[in-house]
Amino acid sequence: MADEINTSAAASTGAEGEAPAAKKSKRKGKKNILNGVVHIQSTFNNTIITITDVSGNVISWSSAGARGFKGSRKSTPFAAQVAAGDAAAKAMEHGLKNVSVFVKGPGAGRESALRALAAAGLKINLIRDVTPIPHNGCRQPKRRRV
């Protein structure tokens, strides 16, 4: 009886010692998309660029933080330019050529992100500002006194 317990304990420890089977990651194939939509969300702290097809399915995205900028450097126009160039390069791998651009937010990276998209080789058909403007909704944060 003691032998049975030891063999079952040895069998269970042997199963634990083995590494679990590695999951095979399935690489997504290249889509063939010609027209897309670029959403630029530019806040005071970061700039996020998302590129979708006309249905709203995300093709690629990038942000200043994802490109390695930290802290106050994320809110600079140069960080927005790098993020936009990265997102455009990823999207152009899927065949994207023509884009409509929707810009949201008051941040510093709005114009530089637009210029980076054009410099990457995307043809910009439309630029629209979709910044939400309240009809006197929530109270604004108090002004900073430095």
Curated annotation (Swiss-Prot):
Signal peptide: none
Residue span of region Disordered: 1-28
Biological process (GO), any one: translation
Biased composition, class Low complexity, residue ranges: 7-22
Matches recorded under InterPro entries: Ribosomal_uS11, Ribosomal_uS11_bac-type, Ribosomal_uS11_CS, Ribosomal_uS11_sf
Gene Ontology molecular function: any one: rRNA binding
Keyword rRNA-binding: yes
Annotated GO CC locations: ribonucleoprotein complex; ribosome
Keywords for this protein: Ribonucleoprotein, Ribosomal protein, RNA-binding, rRNA-binding
The protein's assembly and partners: Part of the 30S ribosomal subunit. Interacts with proteins S7 and S18. Binds to IF-3.
HAMAP family in the cross-refs: Ribosomal_uS11
Known role: Located on the platform of the 30S subunit, it bridges several disparate RNA helices of the 16S rRNA. Forms part of the Shine-Dalgarno cleft in the 70S ribosome.
Family: Belongs to the universal ribosomal protein uS11 family.
Protein name according to UniProt: Small ribosomal subunit protein uS11
Organism from which the protein derives: Myxococcus xanthus (strain DK1622)
Gene assigned in the entry: rpsK
